[in-house]
Amino acid sequence: MRAGAGGLLAAVCLAATAHPAVAKTRFFPLPMYTTVPNEGSTYGAMPVFMVASDDDPDKVKSITAPSVSWNSSAGVTGTFRYYRYLEMFRSWHLLLSASTTINRSVWFTYDDDRRTPRALTLNILVRMRRNLFYRYWGLGPNTVPESESSYTRLFAVASARVGWNVTSDFNVGVYGEVRGDSPERHALEGLPATQDLYPDAPGLGGAALVRAGLNVRYDTRLQGDYSPAGFAAELSGDVGHGITGVGWIGQFTGTARVLVPEFSFLQGAARFYWMQVVGNDVPFYDRASLGGEVLFRGFPENRFIDMGAWQVEAEQRFKLFQTHFFGVVADWRIDPFVAAGQVYGQTAPWEHVRGSVGAGLRMFIHPDILGRIDLAYAGEGLRAYVVLGYPY
């Protein structure tokens, strides 16, 4: 879930858990603020309607959250959000959004990640987006901040994954995807257009492809990212065929993350990420990248792009104190972190390693809501990320 909306939904759930049995439907008018490096600050208001479950008032059945916001580049944006929680590990959500300047979005997901052994799982994604905040610095690990350019990206993707639980922790699956991308010549004020600064960048003419692959997941974290302890790993590989703008493309990805309880006030967390892309005439937006609120904080989104990428990261999550208001339990924390990583293509994967350091100011609302303000430095200025959820 992106910044702004996510952070506000955290506040909604905080308020909603205070007296869940008072009414089946509760209303919360909330202010809205988000900031990420590529987009700047966004301000607005979001009325939220939360409906409690029919059989258990302590559980949320649905959340409806329309909003109106303003950003200096996108103008006024109207957004409709609906989240439906069907049962444990099964939900769907729909987002519709339009701005007075360029931006449009349709986003639907359905997730059935039940943990029952020998049961089928299903994940569906349909997304269409036009957004003016994309940046491009060129290819390779040695691009400099001064090489920044701007473009608008129009893309559509539809994907599905069907899995089978070998055990409650181990799932194997197959997935398929159809996607199309079209970079457009709409640059942010003060930045050169990517089409002018990088006229030979692969993929500027647009591309479409279909692909299919295999995926294996192992996860002992009973509450996902919010578990006190556990280990998760995922391996995937797919092969795609270009419809237009690209030949063939292969993508291989591996991730691993671990959560370790050290003391009552301290939790350790670490992650490893790797992606390798192979193929002919692969567009830059289909290659491996680092930078953003999840991978390599300290750099803006997609700061480095190439055919391969890796990153390692570790956090120490310190609980400063705990509050109890209206039956809501919240941990207030400061979580310092360090990271190292690199994109690579023609160069060796260890030839131009970069690092970043930072700290997260976080509020964890039991059992599974976290709002964070992460501050990170990687040699190109201090970056701030106001978002919901752990980076891993």
PLM ranges: what are they?
Residues Q195-G205, L209-I334, V386:
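C-terminal outer-membrane beta-barrel translocator/porin domains of Gram-negative envelope proteins
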Residues P336-Y344:
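Small/polar (Gly/Ser/Thr/Ala-rich) solvent-exposed segments
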Residues T25-F27, E39-Y43, A74-G78, I102-V106, ...:
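Residues that define the transmembrane beta-barrel architecture of outer-membrane proteins
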Residues K24-P29, T35-L204, L370-G371, Y377-Y392:
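Gram-negative/organellar outer-membrane beta-barrel architecture
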Residues A21-R26, S53-K61, E87-S91, R115-T121, ...:
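Short loop/turn motifs that connect adjacent beta-strands in outer-membrane beta-barrel proteins
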